[in-house]
């Protein structure tokens, strides 16, 4: 049995400190050579996620990127990822390639239906990106919220551009948000 934890946004401020995960379990289904490989689908559940055929009525999200190892040690998920599934290493009786091991890793997931919290302004997703809105959560930290005001908290700032260094932000910038990636500084201004 493989154990998976799902998260729908990074906890912590500045655009991504770490995942807020909910542990869940799953059993390999045998649909692909690798458990939850790119373009395979998962079901949703309150206690488990399973690999299912993407044409199944149980399919809820598609894998858009898949990496071995821990999130903190690996590449960032694509910008419009809706949530991340964390896969714990297991040694089940049957697995994806017959070697007796499902390695630790993570799958970057995109929901099959709207809403997409990973879209710019969507109010969630594991990464803060250009077009997202944030609010102050205290102690110099910010959290993402929906730009349309439908989130738990109203938006205070919108990330309007991403740059390499703060000095490259427009003069109208009032808040700098840590984004990660090749342009790690988000330039934000009041909504």
Model segments located where?
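Primary mode marks residue(s) on the alpha4-beta5-alpha5 output face of response regulator receiver
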Residues: 8-191
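C-terminal motif of bacterial Sec signal peptides marking the signal peptidase cleavage site
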Residues: 3-6
